[in-house]
UniProtKB/Swiss-Prot annotation:
Cross-referenced PROSITE patterns: UBX (PS50033)
Quaternary structure (record): Identified in a complex that contains SEL1L, OS9, FAF2/UBXD8, UBE2J1/UBC6E and AUP1. Interacts with YOD1. Interacts (via N-terminus) with UBQLN2 (via C-terminus). Interacts with PNPLA2. Interacts with ZFAND2B; probably through VCP. Interacts with LMBR1L and UBAC2.
InterPro entries: FAF1_2-like_UAS, Thioredoxin-like_sf, UAS, UBA-like_sf, UBA_8, Ubiquitin-like_domsf, UBX_dom, UBX_domain-protein
Modification N-acetylalanine, positions: 2
Organism: Mus musculus (Mouse)
Keywords: Acetylation, Coiled coil, Cytoplasm, Endoplasmic reticulum, Lipid droplet, Unfolded protein response
Protein name: FAS-associated factor 2
Length: 445
């Protein structure tokens, strides 16, 4: 019996599912299936995105749009967790605190005034983002040099790319803004952010994007998220169809507390991702259904068009055939009319029939192909052409024929030919005073 994750899969999809699991090492079959479905079962794209995810590289198969996503930071339901610095303890602690308070106040006041005045002289170079990816890579290298290579997988792309990938994959995005000059940054990175339990949680359940606020890209994100202190973490997810900050963690937080807070934020907002995933699947199904309906409509339309085309072709074929039959009929009528006119002309041109008493006359009995007989007299001096014209003028005669004598059996040259350009006379042809000639039908030859 197939596992639940493998139900409704074709053999090819099952093979891809097992191959993808072997290549990526993901234990959950359902997670493998979701990854392949997100890439339309494109094995190469799914594996490459999984490798990119492990290295923190944005997807190369789904480039982000040119316009960055807007993040909703004005939601009053944002979960905020702030860790304040511990209060001084004992008389010595309070004494040191009170002595340093005026100096600290003066230092930060002068520093703020200096920075404010400097803006009028020279704009903050961090406000111009020229190489955002370079800022991320530079921070990642400096982080590894200072805190080691054991850390959560950095997303090696811009903030906008991270937002787009988190939205596309329906995952949580954890943003870390690093304050280089803050006194708690080093301790947080070494003890909390690089803790094995924290690394495992972040790598398995969310995307992780980080940058220093001293970098233009980090400064730009800082202006959008408006952190109050460092270390600063913001949890962002797709909520109500907008990328929204759902949690803010500020201050020096301990590893266990960090894990608890991140888990709490994810558990509290997991229903939104589930709801969005269901809505997305419903939209995809609706889109697939609409596409199938469109394809069915187009197929029906093409079938109707093909049927209409064949109908027009059949109608045109019948029209051409009827026109051809009509033309043949007209041509046959013209031919018959021309033949009849030719018969009448031949009849009018025949010389008069000699009298029976004329010694130079020849009595010829013609036996026609329809077994009828015709008798007429001709003069010995007349050409055999006269005999042919007489027979041609008869209504019973075929259109094409030849005249044959029986004793001896021969064909009389009644029409001009290469052998007989001028047909002979009856006398030259050797006809006697009384002859029986046979008319041979040549119409079908």
């Amino acid at each position: 019996m197939a596992a639940p994750e493998e139900q409704d899969l074709t053999q090819e999809q099952t093979e891809k599912l097992l191959q993808f699991q072997d290549l990526t090492g993901i234990e959950s079959m359902e997670q493998c299936r979701l990854a392949l479905e997100q890439h339309n079962w494109n094995m190469e794209a799914a594996v490459q995105d999984r490798l990119n995810e492990q290295e923190g590289v944005p997807s190369v198969f789904n480039p982000p749009p040119a316009r960055p996503l807007q993040v909703n930071t004005a939601d009053h339901r944002i979960y905020s967790y702030v860790v304040s610095r511990p209060q001084p303890r004992g008389l010595l602690g309070w004494g040191y605190y009170l002595i340093m308070l005026p100096f600290r106040f003066t230092y930060y006041t002068i520093l703020d005034i200096f920075r404010f005045a400097l803006r009028f002289i020279r704009p903050d170079p961090r406000s111009r983002v020229t190489d955002p990816v370079g800022d991320i890579v530079s921070f990642m290298h400096s982080f590894e040099e200072k805190y080691g290579r054991a850390h959560p997988v950095f997303y090696q792309g811009t903030y906008s790319q991270a937002l787009n990938d988190a939205k596309r994959e329906l995952r949580f995005l954890l943003v870390y803004l690093h304050g280089d000059d803050h006194q708690d940054s080093d301790e947080f990175c070494r003890n909390a952010l690089c803790a094995p339990e924290v690394i495992s949680l972040i790598n398995s359940r969310m995307l992780f994007w980080a940058c220093s606020t001293n970098k233009p890209e980090g400064y730009r994100v800082s202006q959008a998220l408006r952190e109050n202190t460092y270390p600063f973490l913001a949890m962002i997810m797709l909520k109500d169809r907008r990328m929204t900050v759902v949690g803010r963690l500020e201050g020096l937080i301990q590893p266990d507390d960090l894990i608890n807070q991140l888990t709490f934020i994810m558990d509290a907002n997991q229903t939104y991702l589930v709801s969005e995933r269901l809505e997305r699947e419903e939209r995809n199904q609706t889109q697939v259904l609409r596409q199938q309906q469109d394809e069915a409509y187009l197929a029906s339309l093409r079938a109707d068009q093909e049927k209409e085309r064949k109908k027009r072709e059949e109608k045109e074929r019948k029209r051409r055939k009827e026109e051809e039959v009509q033309q043949q009929k007209l041509a046959e009528e013209r031919r018959r009319q021309n033949l009849q006119e030719e018969k009448e002309r031949k009849l009018e041109c025949l010389p008069p029939e000699p009298s029976p008493d004329d010694p130079e006359s020849v009595k010829i009995i013609f036996k026609l192909p329809n077994d009828s007989r015709v008798e007429r007299r001709f003069h010995f001096s007349q050409s055999l052409t006269v005999i042919h014209d007489f027979l041609f003028s008869l209504k019973e005669s075929p259109e094409k024929f030849q005249i044959e004598a029986n004793f001896p059996r021969r064909v009389l040259p009644c029409v001009p030919s290469e052998e007989w350009p001028n047909p002979p006379t009856l006398q030259e042809a050797g006809l006697s005073h009384t002859e029986v000639l046979f008319v041979q039908d040549l119409t079908d030859e």
